[in-house]
Amino acid sequence: MADAEDIQPLVCDNGTGMVKAGFAGDDAPRAVFPSIVGRPRHTGVMVGMGQKDAYVGDEAQSKRGILTLKYPIEHGIVSNWDDMEKIWHHTFYNELRVAPEEHPILLTEAPLNPKANREKMTQIMFETFSVPAMYVAIQAVLSLYASGRTTGIVLDSGDGVSHTVPIYEGYALPHAILRLDLAGRDLTDSLMKILTERGYSFTTSAEREIVRDIKEKLAYVALDYEQELETAKSSSSVEKSYELPDGQVITIGAERFRCPEVMFQPSLIGMEAPGIHETTYNSIMKCDVDIRKDLYGNIVLSGGSTMFPGIADRMSKEITALAPSSMKIKVVAPPERKYSVWIGGSILASLSTFQQMWISRAEYEESGPAIVHRKCF
């Protein structure tokens, strides 16, 4: 009998901003690295430096000063398959150090992912990486699994896209899924703009990463935006300083909550779209009247862009204002929500009942990539 680790399924959550990968049954991903592929902007002049024509993940991040960084996943959906293949190759061989042909693999996808994309994903796994079996699961559904529920509405907001996905007894309700093309990357861009207005210049793809760090460390969601703006004007209680890589120290005040406020008021960056609270409410209203109560009572936050302090309280306040007055509203923000999609995948792939759900190599060879629509829903 082969060692259990040999046949342990792999779980790979490919986000717009970060790849989370590891082994089914683990309680956290082993590898978390940026979904970026970097190519040198200059020609190498030093022989024997071992320069590569492309760098992936952390290595691309650390050499960002001399590279052009590209994200192969935009708004949660793969747009550049060659680069995506590089990322998967890096995941298996360099990060997890496994042979993909020996492990079943569970991949994740954005809700409302185009059919052609799922097929392409399936094809690459079987043909390029020769996996023995694979499955594609919807990200938000996995987050709900991770929270120990089978019914609820998930607001999943990552780097590239936000979704509200109502799930009843384990089934996503596709007619009520809403997508909002506003997420972490837009918040970073908006913060870059705000800081530029204040005279700091952040323009390159490398400098954007600095701003992302400022956002992750210092931003928070105000319970009452207007009131918070008044407080920021009259006192320095919200000011914090941040040291840039070159030693320069910048002070940021109202920007700390102006940046994530965009999620509740997309009009702040000129987007004509409802905020995350309204999107969640609209999703619930598209569901059958009999299940709304269960959804209002199980609003689950998931993804890196729900990590801002204060977001759950604000969400609760905003939805309470929209919902019927007698409705009991509960917003759940699990502490591990940054990785809850991955954790849900880890749980799912290790269930004994899941083992008949895998798409096997034989099934793929018989039916081709379209098999994914029949087996994964």
From Swiss-Prot:
Its main location: cytoplasm. It catalyses: ATP + H2O = ADP + phosphate + H(+). Coiled coil: none annotated. One of its GO terms (cellular component) is cytoskeleton. Keywords: ATP-binding, Cytoplasm, Cytoskeleton, Hydrolase, Nucleotide-binding. InterPro entries: Actin, Actin/actin-like_CS, Actin_CS, ATPase_NBD. CDD domains: ASKHA_NBD_actin. One of its GO terms (molecular function) is hydrolase activity. It is found in: Cytoplasm, Cytoskeleton. It holds the Pfam family Actin. Its EC number is 3.6.4.-. There are at least eight actin genes in rice. Actins are highly conserved proteins that are involved in various types of cell motility and are ubiquitously expressed in all eukaryotic cells. Belongs to the actin family. This is Actin-2.
